[in-house]
Amino acid sequence: HLLLNKLGLITFYGPNFLNDIAELGNNMLPYTLKYFLGFFNLENLMKIVPSKVWYEERKDFSSKSIGTERICHQELRGFELLQGKKIFSGILMGGCIDSLYSLISGDRYPDEKDINDKYELVPIGKKWSGKILFLETSESKITPEDLEIKLNMLKDKGIFNYINGIIVGKPQDEVYYDEYKSIYKKVVQNIDLPIMYNVNFGHAYPRTILPLGINVKVDANKQCIQLLEQPLYNIGEKSNG
């Protein structure tokens, strides 16, 4: 995503083939399907609202699970504003904090850090001005202590000094749900910086699609993220123009 975005391309942070399109149940999860179909019906993609339910990750991915549905729970919270203005806007940029940390620190593969340092895949300093940082945790369900370390690395890079706000994906299976909230507020240490939590993207189910590089408005009152520009265009119309 970061490499393609640096080249000026809009990329889409969302469903993948194995976990979503090839869902072991009888159909794709309805919420995920709605936003996936936004690639063919743009109206579906322009406004992101909370899912009414959430699903647990599967424990069994064998052939025995084909045709079985995921364990489903009622969503009780919706998008949660942890602090800051109820309405904020900016250009989406971000990713999985586990991966961003590895890319910047080289803790997993040393050459990742070399590549990031050389090409500046993760923007630095003022290049975050006007951006909304989106973050989520992976299926590894890192501890709150580990999340604090990773967030502090972003803080040390000065990212929180420039962004317009943060949106945070629902933790998979709601593991460390409340603990993560406390860590975000503790590390950011700026009550004026908006943090919207429990948004349906990332490694939790179901999930929407976030287009990197697109300007959006986040509205806690209306419980929505509104895309302010189209992430797709009609190729025929574009070429004729």
Indicate residue ranges for each PLM-predicted region:
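Structured loop/turn residues at beta-strand edges in well-structured enzyme cores
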Residues: 7, 128, 158-161
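Peripheral docking tails and interdomain loops at the edges
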Residues: 3-44, 51, 190, 199-241
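Short Gly/Thr/Asp-enriched flexible loops that form oxyanion-binding sites at enzyme active sites
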Residues: 1-4, 179-181
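Alpha-helical scaffold segments in soluble metabolic enzymes
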Residues: 2, 35, 99-103
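C-terminal active-site/capping subdomain that shapes the small-molecule cofactor and substrate pocket
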Residues: 137, 141-240
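Oxyanion-binding "anion nests"
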Residues: 92-144
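Conserved anion/nucleotide-ligand pocket segment
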Residues: 9-98
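Structural motif
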Residues: 9-12, 90-91, 131-133, 164-167, ...
